[in-house]
Swiss-Prot record:
It comes from Delftia acidovorans (strain DSM 14801 / SPH-1). InterPro entries: DUF520, UPF0234-like_C, UPF0234_N, YajQ-like_sf. Coiled coil: none annotated. Keywords: Nucleotide-binding. NCBIfam families: PRK05412.1 (NF003819). This is Nucleotide-binding protein Daci_4781. One of its GO terms (molecular function) is nucleotide binding. Belongs to the YajQ family.
Amino acid sequence: MPSFDTVCEADFVEVKNAVENTAKEIGTRFDFKGTSAAIELKDKEITLFGDADFQLQQVEDILRNKLTKRSVDVRFLDIQKAQKIGGDKLKQTIKVKNGIEAELGKKLQKLIKDSKLKVQAAIQGDAVRVTGAKRDDLQAAMALIRKDLADHPLSFNNFRD
């Protein structure tokens, strides 16, 4: 029986490269000379440092630009509020989403069930497996998911025939 998995995964090699390129650009830009603007990546979490809000915003814009150039969807980023870390310095954490949350998985499962397509959806950890009798039904399910859940960075993998 044909099937595929719906997942929400960022390419962490490309995320790491984008963070490194952002750090390199911060080091060479004139407007960041003599400031504490920096960026680092630890365990699927990006941390931005700066002296003021506008610096954090500039670093974030550079990061978004680098991620887009590397074909990483910026919807994977979960941006937290900036925090003061002593003196006038600020820190902002950006979490990189990985895996489908339970709420989104249930929404996806309900969407497929309500569509009256001849496919079944099952939540398997941080992925949703969709199985059906025909490939055409699976392709219709993929089109439905792309259309209705366009605000989530979902991708399809693990195709089986």
